[in-house]
Curated annotation (Swiss-Prot):
Taxonomic path: Eukaryota, Metazoa, Chordata, Craniata, Vertebrata
Protein name: Probable RNA/DNA demethylase ALKBH6
EC numbers on record: 1.14.11.-
An MF annotation (GO) of this entry: dioxygenase activity
Keywords: Cytoplasm, Dioxygenase, Iron, Metal-binding, Nucleus, Oxidoreductase
UniProt: 2-oxoglutarate binding residues: N102, Y104, R218, S220
The keyword Iron is annotated on this UniProt entry: yes
Pfam (any one): 2OG-FeII_Oxy_2
């Protein structure tokens, strides 16, 4: 599979032999940057954290909503990395304006899902602290379109599992195009991962098929562009 040549700085990191497009950059940040970012995450005020089943998170930049996001200024420790990633051109002419910080303890995960239409169809993720496996799945409705025999449609996550990507600490992952829009993604709640040939980016990583990796606490910075932003003046009823 050939690179699209839209992102010359990323072309050499394209994960091959999978639907377009995933770019995996190991050691995107240094260990000292990782330590700095983790300090900033855990120094955030307690009200910034939201506890969900299987993870907890922080929203930075605003709360995305179907009617529009009331944009908030990003802190400088995040702005540096949103600027860096935006400069790669992955959001077109736009700059990232939203960061979701997730914390996953070993044994935690998130069910297969799609990010939905509130976001520009590209997601970028910096991983901190520990590895994980990001799994991709064929949606049931896509399988229904591709087979004429309803009985053959896979019904379980295991049957619909298409591929996985190993996300190592300090790595950057960019997912866009068909892989972003046509497939579900999730993280299986496990305490360890045995790497199989289904892990599509082993050739881009330091790990090997058959390795078993123990999960620790992982923090992810999910950096995106939210196109629909509300102006504060409109929210306050001004500018009529």
């Amino acid at each position: 599979m050939q690179a699209c040549h839209n992102f010359p700085d990323l072309d050499s990191f394209l994960v091959e032999k999978i639907p377009l497009a995933a770019y995996y950059v190991p050691e995107y940040i240094s260990k000292s940057e990782e330590e700095y970012l983790l300090r900033q995450v855990y120094n955030a005020p307690k009200p910034k954290w939201t506890q969900l089943s299987g993870r907890k998170l922080q929203n930075w930049g605003g709360l995305p909503h179907s009617r529009g996001m009331v944009q908030e200024k990003l802190p400088s420790w995040l702005q540096k990395y949103t600027d860096q990633i935006s400069s790669l051109g992955v959001f077109g002419d736009h700059s990232a304006n939203h960061v979701l910080v997730n914390e996953y303890n070993a044994g935690e995960g998130i069910m297969p899902h799609e990010d939905g239409p509130m976001y520009y169809p590209t997601v970028t993720t910096i991983s901190l602290g520990s590895h994980t496996l990001l799994d991709f799945y064929v949606p049931i409705n896509k399988e229904c379109q591709e087979t004429q025999n309803q009985d053959k449609v896979a019904s379980t996550e295991e049957q619909r599992h298409m591929l996985s990507l190993l996300l190592e600490p300090r790595s950057l992952l960019v997912v866009r195009e068909e892989l972003y829009t046509s497939y579900l993604h999730g993280i299986c709640p496990r305490t360890s991962d045995t790497l199989s040939p289904m892990v599509a980016n082993l050739g881009n990583s330091t790990a090997h098929a058959g390795d078993t990796l123990q999960r620790g606490t992982r923090v992810s910075l999910t950096i995106r562009f939210v196109p629909k932003v509300l102006k504060t003046s409109l929210l306050l009823g001004k500018g009529r």
